[in-house]
């Protein structure tokens, strides 16, 4: 086992370290067989993970300190972005020595995740119970059968040092708020990260390649009741079962910088192997820009579109800071939306007219509808001032020609006036701006409201 650094570093470095540690705990190798790794059923049920490297030293008194990351499983089955954490603790007794330990803590309950996200700290053995986690397939049935009475946290560890035992009772896991703010943005909190409100940037891709492997999405044919037949034994012991977990996470690994959108990762899970859709090169945010400028940074202060922070998270988070009421945001984008709508009408009308007799019947109906709308608008607003381009400044009411968008993933809404929707819903766009780093107004399922534009894709 290699030696990992317990000293707190940047969140990008901590995430890469966490990916290496987690892979060593869930993927069998020449030293640890399939019966000496965390069972897939335990990983499947996990509500969250904390991965930490701890240095323990003592002479009469002992102290523990280390750093790592914590992630939470969201309601849709995906994982939150990682939050930087640190661990600290102390003990007493005749202990002499030094020890370096890698820990993986499986958070089995939503309360354990909520306790950390709400208060930024949990105390192992204090406000959450902790016990040694089961190992291998032989322990998986017992863990499944007693799932209702397990400890809130399972602890797994690998040590290198002189201490005979490993104990984390009384240790506190705390949020490294400054590291989170430096990586994600000034006002970012652990609660926002673990609730899924912060999108994972490409810089944390190594960890997600492990989290979205088959080992974390194991589905036995018996429905997870804990008994295994011969076919399931063969499948579990199959060498290909863990092939989607990388063996290394070097910086030269080309796949470690692949785009990392939620939709890409969810599509990857449906295949027999963990692959990325090369056609979808949208960056959630970061050093790369998407082809359709879905998450391109807003141009302010002559920045030239370049990001100052390595992950790009600060620009992303700043562009989504909500200011004012929902009504003021809607008013701010109304005029821009009106111009865009008339631009679309002009383009559609002219292109349809030029096609002449070659138009199909559907296009004829659309052009006629647009023509009638223009005629009515000109009659009813003859005294309305026009811009230099001849466009009206007052928008017409939305019609069947309003743009549509498909939800890339679910949005529960944060305030009154927000438009909640589920992944896959088709949303009618009522008001929009030129940028998807903005809040648009739409309608779905009979409701109207505003929503973050980068949650959807125009169709």
Curated annotation (Swiss-Prot):
- Cite the record's Low complexity compositional bias ranges: 243-262, 393-403
InterPro entries, alphabetically? SH3-like_dom_sf, SH3_domain, SH3_domain_YSC84-like, SYLF_SH3YL1-like, Ysc84_actin-binding
Q: Which residues are annotated with the PTM Phosphoserine? A: 227, 300, 303, 397, 402, 416
* Entries under CDD domains matching the protein: SH3_Ysc84p_like (cd11842), SYLF_SH3YL1_like (cd11525)
Query: Region Disordered: what ranges?
Result: 219-403
Do you know which Pfam families this protein is assigned to? Answer: SH3_1, Ysc84
Q: Compositional bias (Acidic residues) spans?
A: 229-242, 340-350
Asked whether the keyword Hydrolase is assigned, the reply is no
Could you tell me what this protein is called?
LAS seventeen-binding protein 3
Q: Which organism is it from?
A: Saccharomyces cerevisiae (strain ATCC 204508 / S288c) (Baker's yeast)
| Gene that encodes the chain | LSB3
